[in-house]
Amino acid sequence: MTANETQEQSLYQRLGGYDAIAAATDDLLGRLQGDPRIKDFWKGASADNRRKARQLIVDFMTEAAGGPAYYVGRDMKTSHEGMQISEADWAVFMEHSAATLDHFGVPAREREEVLGFFESLKGEIVEIA
């Protein structure tokens, strides 16, 4: 593969495709749901609810990265409205996101693209300064 072919690949392809995004999602959700600082966001969620949310995240990320998925969930603002997500909660999310990307050895370029994409969503998700 030439350097030009690498540059022409979508982020989805460069991340390793659907299975890689699904594995990273599982890792990230495990980190978030196990962190005492933010685990209460999942308090009371049934196993079915968690599975559905996980699949929506995988589809959202796959579509956003240029992959063959169609996200059918609500927009980020509506999905997170009323959750009272704070700047501190967001910082924990970003910390775990970076740790997940590092865990999977995601190269710097792709790591920055993913984290930059997450940052672009912050205004739709964080409700408390």
Residue ranges and their predicted role:
Residues 1-129:
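Core of compact, soluble alpha-helical bundle domains
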